[in-house]
Amino acid sequence: MAYINKKFRLPQFTLGVEEEFQVIDPKTRELRSHMHQIVEGGKVILKEQVKAEMHQSVVEVGTNICKDVSEARKEVTYLRQMVAKLAHKQGLVIAAAGTHPFSRWQDQLITDHPRYEEIIREMQDAARSNLIFGLHVHIGIDDREIGIRLMN
């Protein structure tokens, strides 16, 4: 068990969660490069909480900055429900997994955005083939020194 100095105070923290979902054809189960319809449909309701990613078969959602885990859980649940509904309206489904089991990365369209174009130009197939889907938890800590100690 790690020793914690009695002078060590618990830091105040915030958190945010981002999830990247696969956009899937419900009949073939292949990835579909139709993220734009989901993102555009979601902008009215979810505003900046729904985003495009480099591959058009990926849709990303992200919580606001949350004050605790309970608030983050509620937002994540809501975002999952909303992105599933948005996909359903387009005749698609979403899935959460690290990668797709059989869709070819070569078949995936790249989102038209200067940042992604630069990444593809510099990294080429290493970037194109990086067809992964993640869940990211971002933690904000009010004291940098304590943050470094926690990371160590």
Feature-to-residue mapping (PLM):
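Helical (often loop-to-helix) elements that flank the catalytic cores of nucleotide-handling enzymes
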Residues: 113, 119-120, 143-152
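Terminal catalytic/cofactor-binding subdomain
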Residues: 1-126, 131-133
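An acidic/histidine-cluster motif and surrounding catalytic segment
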Residues: 137
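Histidine/acidic-residue-rich, glycine-tolerant segments that coordinate divalent metal ions
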Residues: 140
